Amino acid sequence: MKKPLKEVIKDVSRDHLKKGNQLFGQCLSAVGWVGGTVPELSESDGLVELSMADVMAGGVITGAALVGTRPIYVVRYQGFQWFNASIIANYAAKSKDLWGIPCPIFIRSIAMEGGIGPVAGSSHHGIVYRMPGIRIASPMIGLIPFIYF
């Protein structure tokens, strides 16, 4: 029997953290651990709880990638990407081409439709779809995104 997708995501995230990487996000350890997809670990294991200031996360994640970690950034709702997309798209995604410095970031952004408001709901990955250096994947692809990360 195959594992549910949330268990696969949790296991892959745990393995990634065991390699000395970090997982960032807001309210990661809050009720449900982001739908059961975040391993129940602590900051010493690489789990980083970001503040609720929606505009600072892109810079923190980009900085983490530039110092050599391979951060996973969990965004609870894709609508919040509007606040963080600028530095990720214009600095992190272009860093390798412009300065020869790789800046790998894996962003897990949850897409939902309806019922949760005009900012949090819907799928907003189109705002970065055409940016050089950014690849978009969906759960239907399975573990392929992690292989290339």
Model-based region annotation:
Residues 1-149:
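Thiamine diphosphate
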